[in-house]
Design a protein with these regions (language model features):
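N-terminal secretory signal peptides and thylakoid transit peptides that target proteins
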Residues: 2-17
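Short alpha-helical segments used as structural interaction elements across diverse proteins
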Residues: 5-6, 20-21, 54-57
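Bacterial Sec-dependent signal peptides at the C-terminal "C-region" and cleavage site
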Residues: 17-30
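Mature catalytic domains of secreted/periplasmic carbohydrate-active enzymes
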Residues: 28-515
Length: 515
């Protein structure tokens, strides 16, 4: 069958329309979905009572490790799909290094995923030093390969590849350091995403020869698709049978039960309505069981409608909210490609730090992915970025952790660039000395100067008789600077004479004591 090629961005763009439309259709009740008893049942009305735990609001910064069999070729994200799309660079690379897809498919890539340099304890030390308060492990990507000791599929990291319980090892390392632990599931769409593996070349010496996804021996990896399955790939649950929905529920429930994540991330909207709602209720109820009746777990969805009235945390992939959101939210983004890609351009440390401050000022958290290569060891450029974040957080993290938004998130040219939700980060420029961002903690206001001022910093929103009614300022400090500052507050704003040496690269933080 001919399969249409969608990019990740265009596929995710279908979420806003397709999923709500599907949900308006009356769903038949799913039977036999056993969940932990507790305060929630698997309905939207019940889940409206959910409230985001304070630890998540305080944490602000998490690190994610996209890692799995697709990391082994080191050719970037969606390799297991793109390698079956004739003409795609991944298709060509696969033929050059493995052979024709009709003979050597993704199943044959999996044994090359060794993780021979994987050291979760060392990695977690680096992540913690960089200031991450929570860590995310890949649970299962669209490639249908579980990174834990799964009892629902032989295609898992304990049975093949590195032959280790990757989720379990990451969890142990994170919890030992007092970090919260999250897992991501991208499984729900795998049924459609892997449809290309059932195709064949249109041209060349193997034209018409079916790819290895057509072999019944491989259906437990590539899925047993009907011969008349729709050729067009769409990011929704149309055409996905109830048997797969139930399998998804059982498999992710197994992940939740055995690894008790503090955060569960779905790549997309909450899947399969009643199946998904019951899974979220199970996650929350099990958390309440383990925490004396208090729900400490978090579930994230990328669909605004899922999170409008409690239920879960809204996640923006490679984007951010336009303004201060009333409820906590999260940006998930990457220093480069989601899965490891050789020689790709990475975000600079300044870009990453700008994003963190900007996001926190709007009531959000940043989840930053450092993709691991197949070996399981970070590359030198990733280590350099982590080192810069570590240095910056050592000076400025007081203005990040456990803070809340102020009356406005900021001032300056960067505030005029709209957030607009998902996939907008490429249109944003690094912030400059003309930009300021704000956070608060009690009677302390933190003003982040996003670039180093020449001599004097002027923070206009902190004017003595301005519209924001700041009131009288009692004291001003510069985080990381031991000396006293000369400052005044008048109708033009807060004016601070800056020292000759800046206490940190990138953004610097004024600690303002309000009256």
């Amino acid at each position: 069958m001919g399969i249409m090629y969608l990019t990740r961005r265009s596929a995710m763009g279908l979420l806003a329309g397709a999923i709500p439309a599907a949900r308006r259709a009356a769903a038949q009740p799913a039977t036999g979905l056993e969940i932990q008893k507790g305060p929630f049942v698997g309905t939207r009305d019940s889940l409206k009572a959910y409230r985001v735990p304070e630890w998540f609001r305080d944490a602000k910064f998490g690190i994610w490790a996209h890692w799995g069999p697709q990391s082994a070729p080191e050719q970037g994200d969606w390799y297991a799909r793109k390698m079956y799309i004739e003409g795609d660079p991944a298709y060509k690379w696969h033929q050059q290094h493995f052979g024709p897809q009709s003979k050597v498919g993704f199943k044959d890539v999996i044994p090359t995923f060794k993780g021979e340099k994987f050291d979760p304890e060392h990695l977690m030390d680096l992540y913690q030093k960089a200031g991450a308060k929570y860590f995310f492990s890949m649970g299962v990507h669209h490639d249908n390969f579980d990174m834990w000791n799964s009892r629902h599929t032989r295609w898992n990291a304990v049975n093949m590849g590195p032959k280790k319980d990757i989720v379990g090892l990451f969890r142990h390392a994170a919890l030992k350091r007092g970090m919260k632990f999250g897992v991501s599931e991208h499984l729900w769409i795998s049924y459609k995403w892997f449809g290309v593996s059932h195709d064949s070349d249109k041209t060349g010496p193997y034209a018409g020869v079916p790819y290895d996804g057509n072999d019944p021996q491989n259906f437990d990896l590539y899925h047993d698709l009907p011969k008349d399955y729709p050729a067009q790939f769409s990011w929704d649950d149309k055409g996905i049978p109830d048997s797969w929905k139930r399998h998804w529920f059982d498999r992710i429930k197994d992940l939740v039960d055995n690894y008790q994540p503090d955060i569960l991330y779905t790549d997309g909207a909450l899947p399969f309505e009643e199946y998904g709602l019951n899974l979220v209720a199970h996650l929350y109820n099990d958390s309440a069981r383990r925490h004396g009746g208090k729900v400490e777990a978090v579930y994230t969805s990328k669909l605004k409608e899922d999170c409008a009235e409690g239920t879960c945390v809204l996640d923006f992939e490679r984007g951010l909210a336009d303004a201060i959101a009333p409820n906590p939210w999260q940006t998930d983004t990457c220093v480069g490609s989601w899965h490891y890609q050789r020689d790709i351009k990475y975000k600079s440390p300044k870009t990453v730090i700008d994003m963190l401050v900007d996001i926190v000022s709007r009531n959000g958290n940043l989840l930053l992915n450092f993709p691991l290569p197949g070996s399981g060891a970070l590359d030198d450029r990733e280590l350099a970025i982590l080192a810069e974040i570590t240095k910056w957080m050592a000076v400025n993290s007081e203005g990040i952790y456990a803070t809340r938004p102020w009356k406005i998130f900021g001032e300056g040219p960067g505030t005029k660039v709209k957030g607009t939700g998902r996939f907008n980060e490429n249109g944003r420029q690094d912030l400059t000395a003309e930009d300021v961002r704000f956070t608060t903690k009690g009677k302390t206001l933190y003003a982040f100067l996003m670039g180093w001022p020449a001599k004097e910093a002027v923070v206009a929103p902190l004017a003595a008789k301005g519209k924001l009614e700041v009131g009288k300022i009692r004291n001003v400090e510069l985080l990381g600077h031991k000396g006293k500052l000369k400052w005044t507050q008048d109708e033009a704003g807060l004016k601070v004479e800056m020292p000759e040496e800046k206490p940190s690269d990138h953004a610097v933080t004024l600690k303002v004591a309000l009256g």
